[in-house]
Amino acid sequence: MRRRYLVTYDIADEKRLKKVFKVMKDYGDHLQFSVFLCDLNEIEKIRMEGAIRNFMNEKSDQVLIVDLGIATRQVDEEN
């Protein structure tokens, strides 16, 4: 079952920020700077979290993943 997630992050270093942004483009729709809407199954969510955390500095960076519930429709892939 696919669930919808709102993902937002604050990355202190610009180089890491660009890497996280590139990862997130593979998982969801870019809504605003550092904010994505993603429809993911459990495996995709775990992979996304791992990919993001590979580039994060736990002392200075933050990520927030909010579960918005069951995805009732696919996210528009053109955005």
Show the residue positions of the predicted features.
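Basic nucleic-acid-binding interfaces
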Residues: 1-6, 12-79
